[in-house]
């Protein structure tokens, strides 16, 4: 890989940050533009089909609505591809953000504390904007390169913890229990005590919906193994479609819980402004702002740099490598803009980036195609997305969790 000559002063970096057609487009030439556009379009289509069920699942795991994941993934990819520092990176919702965002939404939407979902979402917008400003400043002053210095053991431990958390807190969707909290008892934590909850569930199989468990396991198996056959087989989409078809036909009378049962209809008018919200200030709110801002900055900064580095290696990029400082700048804009339009914080997505590269992505065009195709598919399929079984969403999330743990890295 060539030694990159990136600016070394804040002013030089700012100038580069607003240079939209930079070295990321160096592979697009007059001689090969038709071939490049075709390859990028194909990669964008494959990733868009894979990303829709994942985006919906991540959003619901965070306490958000399904459509929030769709708009967040599309808008983050457009902003990140325009202002980021990587040729190949695909931006969108990631599992690493689930614990951070879920904790914020749960706390500030709790009616017992006088909260509402709108207030919680507005507070998320506020802390995300603060995080974005910090990331931009870090990029301007050349801090991006230091994200590479985070020890691998910390990254692996952090990733494993998130994977375990996702798996343990989403299995109730697979069990198909209509009111999980009543089933456990009011004194139980609906998202805690996994082995106790599992013991209760399988000790009361008459309450567990076996057909829901079947759909969850079927989704997991199809998503996991179809992609191993070929990246051109969109395993998650086929899994989602199969589970939805079965729930609407052969299992229509089996009381399968659907997305619309919990969230109502999914609108296709995605773009709505979500203004920031600041709760009444006290010591607890100040600490929460600091806590969530640090979490968002750490996750978005470190994961985006790691993803960009992985992308260069996977693509065997022997020309200009990614620019970590510009990546921080792009991440900052992602965190500022995306939550304002019914979204939430996003970052570089390792699995979707790898899929995009393997499918032939060469320039940032692949990210634009992914975003546009994702929005178009969601717009025309919104009425069908609400028919997806919640067990299918649980199966998708458990599949994501299983992919996050690599025994060779432990």
PLM regions: where:
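Transmembrane helical cores of multi-pass ion-transport proteins
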Residues: 2-410
């Amino acid at each position: 890989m060539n030694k990159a000559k990136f600016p070394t002063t804040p002013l030089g970096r700012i100038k580069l940050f607003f240079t939209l057609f930079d070295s990321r487009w160096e592979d697009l030439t007059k001689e090969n533009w038709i071939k490049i556009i075709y390859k990028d379009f194909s990669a964008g289509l494959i990733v868009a089909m894979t990303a829709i069920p994942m985006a919906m699942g991540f959003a619901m795991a965070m306490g958000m609505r399904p459509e929030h994941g769709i708009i967040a993934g599309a808008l983050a990819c457009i902003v990140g591809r325009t202002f980021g520092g990587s040729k190949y990176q695909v931006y969108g919702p990631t599992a690493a953000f689930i614990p951070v965002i879920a904790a914020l939404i749960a706390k500030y939407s709790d009616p017992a504390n006088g909260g509402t979902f709108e207030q919680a979402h507005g507070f998320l917008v506020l802390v995300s904007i603060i995080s974005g400003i910090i990331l931009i400043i870090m990029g301007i002053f050349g801090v991006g390169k230091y994200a590479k210095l985070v020890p691998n053991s910390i990254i692996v431990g952090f990733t494993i913890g998130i994977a375990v958390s996702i798996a343990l807190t989403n299995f109730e969707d697979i069990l198909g229990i209509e009111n999980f909290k009543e089933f456990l008892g009011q004194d139980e934590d609906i998202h805690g005590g996994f082995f106790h909850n599992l013991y209760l569930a399988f000790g009361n199989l008459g309450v567990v919906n076996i057909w829901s468990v079947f759909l969850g396991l079927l989704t997991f198996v199809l998503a996991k193994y179809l992609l191993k056959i070929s990246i051109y087989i969109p395993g998650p989409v086929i899994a989602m479609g199969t589970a939805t078809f079965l729930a609407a036909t052969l299992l229509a009378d089996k009381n399968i819980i659907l997305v619309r049962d919990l969230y109502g209809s999914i609108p296709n008018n995605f773009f709505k402004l979500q203004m920031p919200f600041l709760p009444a200030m006290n010591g607890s709110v100040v600490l929460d702002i600091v806590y969530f801002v640090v979490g968002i900055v750490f996750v978005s900064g470190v994961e985006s740099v790691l993803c960009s580095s992985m992308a260069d290696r996977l693509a065997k990029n022997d020309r200009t490598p990614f620019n970590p400082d510009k990546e921080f700048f792009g991440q900052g804009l992602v965190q500022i803009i995306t939550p304002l339009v019914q979204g939430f914080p996003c970052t570089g997505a390792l699995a979707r980036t790898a899929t995009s590269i393997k499918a032939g992505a060469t320039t940032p065009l692949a990210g634009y195609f992914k975003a546009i195709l994702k929005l178009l598919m969601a717009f025309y399929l919104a009425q069908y997305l609400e028919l997806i079984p919640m067990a299918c969403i649980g199966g998708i999330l458990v599949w994501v969790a299983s992919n996050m743990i690599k025994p060779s890295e432990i």
